[in-house]
């Protein structure tokens, strides 16, 4: 019996759509996928995977969906864990367009998570969360839904 082949572009598009829909639901903004998934030149101010058209976006939103869970002991033992590679990409793209980095990610059959350098309400600390600090990287990880339900951060200015 032959197993179905997973198209990584389709899987990425599905994860981006899932994140987009959750952002729309919780923010009331008309989030869209970036044409070409962030491949545009920085002069277009469209890096990352999701944005709000016609608005000044405050975040560069990168979305990743993979089969395996990347919040594991590898964060402390691997030279460059996958999550850190994603964060490096998110941070690099955010810097190119002068925005705050925001990484949304999930693994197969999981909820969506968010990695961010900002949160605005100490009530978030009553939820489950992680802080990652290694080398030059420090960021927080929350369930995306918790972060969106509690945060009052503005996504556009």
Can you describe what each PLM-predicted range is?
Residues 1-157:
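Catalytic phosphate/metal-binding cores of nucleic-acid and nucleotide-processing enzymes, i.e., regions
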């Amino acid at each position: 019996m032959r197993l179905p082949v997973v198209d990584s572009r389709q899987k990425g598009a599905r994860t981006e759509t899932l994140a987009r829909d959750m952002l729309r639901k919780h923010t009331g903004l008309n989030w869209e996928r970036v044409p070409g998934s962030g491949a545009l030149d920085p002069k277009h101010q469209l890096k990352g995977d999701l944005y709000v058209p016609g608005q000044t976006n405050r975040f560069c939103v990168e979305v990743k969906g993979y089969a395996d869970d990347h919040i594991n002991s590898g964060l402390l033992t691997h030279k460059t864990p996958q999550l850190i590679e994603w964060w490096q990409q998110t941070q690099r793209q955010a810097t190119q367009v002068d925005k705050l980095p925001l990484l949304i990610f999930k693994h197969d059959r999981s909820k969506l998570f968010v990695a961010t350098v900002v949160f605005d309400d100490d009530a978030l600390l009553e939820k489950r969360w992680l802080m990652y600090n290694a080398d030059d990287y420090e960021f927080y990880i929350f369930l995306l839904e918790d972060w969106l339900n509690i945060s009052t951060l503005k996504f556009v200015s």
